[in-house]
């Protein structure tokens, strides 16, 4: 009996040791998957982050950054590594004109704690904050692909007093596949906000990109742009007070291929709010869909359930948006459904040099001033314009209730469109 008891006790003791060893091993493995960048050597936070990234090696893991500071060294984030920022202000001193302050390889991510994680763009040289690695490092530039990159939950604040039209981007995804940009606040930044698509060299393009629930305030030029992409979703974003300076053209959402080999396929623009009430000037368009390079790889495009507000519905005000939704330049197969456009200076909806569109269920309120009509269809063919409402709010009487077809337009169908006095037939103007 004593022998049996001793054997049992020994077994229990051994089992406890094994469990303790296993638990300790799990703790060690957990620690092995996380690095605190602040604890590593380096002249600035960027150098410390790179040291932590190297220490993680090829294993997946997280790099934590705490307390704010200066990032002067370009950060290169390896596959499977997530950079996680605590609250604080992180100032970029990278001074890179053609590369991002952060280059993200496939499978890398950057996550903040919320909009209290503030990354301040370089004060003098450079604007690009986040860029996919192969977009710039694989030659020719902007032709490479990366995948599974995610950026979320932080604020990027403008600091460079200069602006850079439509060349660079704050978030440059390039030809990224399965990439997400969510819950960012781009606050007064000086270049394009978020862009999907790079060079079509090698037949490459962005695919399965989601740009969702972001806030864009006073972004100097296009806030979201797609230049070469398939299956891109632009959903639930808010654009406020667009534009920085009256000399800069600005469109909140812009689909615009730059090369005849680019594609614009299966793009969805849904549930966004564009409110330019407090913009400093009439900045351009709310949503622009164009194909000036005449790529064959165009469409379909869905523009649905968006709200475009050019200004307050008050007397003697035309608003700060030119056209609410503008479909133009050899586009095709665009659906514009259930959008609300109010107090824009020019057309609420304008179709020009486009074909095979379906425009239905939209509401235009106090749009069209200065000889420009609320709803213009010019050089447009084989399109359906159904069940739209075009009215003028008495509190904001600048505007008109006119649907007009002009130019070489042909074979378009109109049904169920209404104004404040009932059924609204189009004016047909032939050359």
Predicted regions and their residues:
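Right-handed parallel beta-helix
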Residues: 114, 122-238, 245-246
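Acidic Gly/Asp/Thr-rich repetitive segments characteristic of extracellular carbohydrate-active
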Residues: 36-84
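Extracellular beta-strand-rich solenoid/capping regions of secreted or surface-exposed proteins
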Residues: 70-84, 91-111, 119-152, 160-176, ...
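Bacterial N-terminal signal peptides
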Residues: 7-16
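Positively charged n-region of N-terminal signal peptides that target proteins for export
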Residues: 1-4
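Short "repeat-start/strand-capping" segments in structured domains, especially the N-termini
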Residues: 76-81, 104-108, 147, 176-180, ...
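Short glycine/acidic-rich loop motifs that flank beta-strands on beta-rich extracellular proteins
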Residues: 73-75, 91-98, 114-115, 120-128, ...
């Amino acid at each position: 009996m004593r022998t049996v008891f001793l054997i049992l006790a020994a077994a229990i003791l051994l089992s406890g040791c094994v469990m303790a060893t296993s638990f300790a091993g799990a703790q060690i493995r957990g620690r092995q998957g996380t690095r605190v960048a602040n604890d590593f050597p380096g002249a600035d936070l960027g150098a410390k982050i790179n040291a932590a990234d190297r220490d993680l090696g090829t294993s997946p893991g997280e790099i934590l950054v705490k307390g704010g500071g200066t990032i002067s060294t370009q950060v290169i984030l390896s596959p499977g590594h997530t950079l996680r920022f605590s609250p604080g202000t992180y100032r970029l001193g990278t001074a890179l004109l053609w590369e991002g302050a952060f280059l993200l390889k496939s499978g890398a991510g950057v996550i903040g704690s919320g909009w209290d994680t503030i990354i301040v763009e370089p004060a003098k040289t450079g604007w690009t904050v986040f860029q996919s690695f192969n977009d710039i490092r694989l030659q020719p530039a902007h032709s490479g692909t990366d995948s599974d990159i995610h950026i979320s939950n932080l604020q990027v604040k403008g600091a460079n007093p200069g602006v850079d039209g439509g060349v660079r981007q704050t978030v440059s995804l390039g030809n990224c596949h399965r990439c997400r940009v969510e819950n960012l606040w781009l606050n007064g930044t000086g270049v394009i906000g978020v862009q999907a698509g790079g060079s079509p060299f090698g037949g490459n393009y962005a695919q399965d990109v989601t740009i969702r629930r972001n806030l864009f305030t006073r972004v100097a030029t296009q806030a979201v742009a797609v230049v070469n992409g398939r299956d891109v979703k632009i959903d639930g974003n808010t654009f406020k007070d667009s534009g920085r300076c009256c000399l800069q053209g600005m469109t909140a959402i812009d689909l615009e291929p730059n090369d005849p080999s680019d594609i614009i396929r299966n793009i969805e623009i849904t549930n966004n709010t564009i409110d330019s009430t407090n913009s400093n000037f009439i900045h351009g368009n709310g949503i622009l869909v164009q194909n000036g390079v005449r790529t064959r790889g165009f469409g379909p495009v869905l523009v649905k359930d968006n709200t475009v507000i050019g200004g307050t519905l008050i007397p003697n005000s035309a608003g700060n948006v030119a056209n609410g939704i503008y479909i133009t330049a050899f586009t095709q197969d665009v659906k514009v459904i259930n959008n609300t456009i109010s107090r824009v200076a020019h057309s609420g909806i304008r179709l020009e040099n486009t074909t095979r569109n379906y425009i239905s269920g939209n509401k235009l309120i106090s749009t069209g001033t200065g000889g420009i009509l609320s709803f213009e269809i010019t050089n447009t063919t084989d399109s359906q314009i159904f069940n739209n409402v075009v009215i003028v709010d008495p509190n904001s009487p600048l505007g008109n209730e006119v649907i007009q077809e002009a130019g070489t337009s042909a074979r378009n169908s109109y049904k169920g469109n209404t104004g404040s006095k009932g059924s609204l037939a189009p004016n047909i103007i032939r050359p």
